[in-house]
């Protein structure tokens, strides 16, 4: 595993989550224990497009960041950490629950750890191009 792969995993997961939020909005929100309304579906679909966009940015960052990839890895780790903080807040206040919330929490913690670990590697040990894999 390398930092480029972590970016691809993060990007892929965000694109899949975004697609589910965009095309199966009611099911996704309902599985998190939310009361689905037409207004919430609109917000959920907006989240879906945003998640797809973040996934695309993450996927492409590993190709275009070059030697700055570790710095971007730290930034994306912080982005994922913000999502974890929000999930924990929603759990504590009872605004969301159910298996999807816990799955997102565990996956998010793993991603933060991977971004942190691989961003801390020596620049010489970070695989940046496909030729080096």
What are these regions (language model features)?
Residues 108-129:
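Membrane-water interface at the C-terminal end of transmembrane alpha helices
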Residues 22, 59, 88, 112-116:
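Membrane-embedded alpha-helical segments of multi-pass transporters/permeases
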Residues 85-102:
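Membrane-helix boundary connector in multi-pass membrane proteins
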Residues 57-70, 91-92:
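Juxtamembrane helix-break-helix junctions at the cytosolic face
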Residues 16-20, 40-62, 75-85:
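Core segments of alpha-helical transmembrane spans in multipass integral membrane proteins
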Residues 3-6, 14-41:
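Membrane-helix boundary elements
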Residues 7, 11, 48, 73, ...:
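Residues within membrane-spanning alpha-helices of integral membrane proteins
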Residues 29-35, 126-133:
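Cytosolic, membrane-interface loops and tails of multi-pass inner-membrane proteins
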């Amino acid at each position: 595993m390398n930092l480029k792969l972590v970016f691809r995993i993060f990007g892929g997961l965000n694109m899949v989550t975004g697609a589910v939020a965009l095309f199966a909005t009611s099911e996704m929100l309902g599985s998190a224990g939310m009361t689905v309304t037409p207004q919430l579906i609109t917000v959920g679909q907006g989240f879906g497009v945003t998640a797809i966009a973040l996934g695309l940015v993450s996927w492409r960052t590993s190709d275009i960041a070059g030697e700055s990839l570790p710095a971007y890895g730290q930034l994306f780790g912080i982005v994922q950490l913000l999502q974890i903080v929000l999930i924990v807040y929603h759990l504590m206040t009872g605004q969301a629950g159910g298996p999807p919330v816990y799955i997102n929490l565990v996956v998010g913690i793993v991603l933060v750890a991977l971004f942190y670990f691989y961003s801390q590697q020596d620049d010489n040990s970070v695989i940046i191009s496909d030729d080096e894999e």
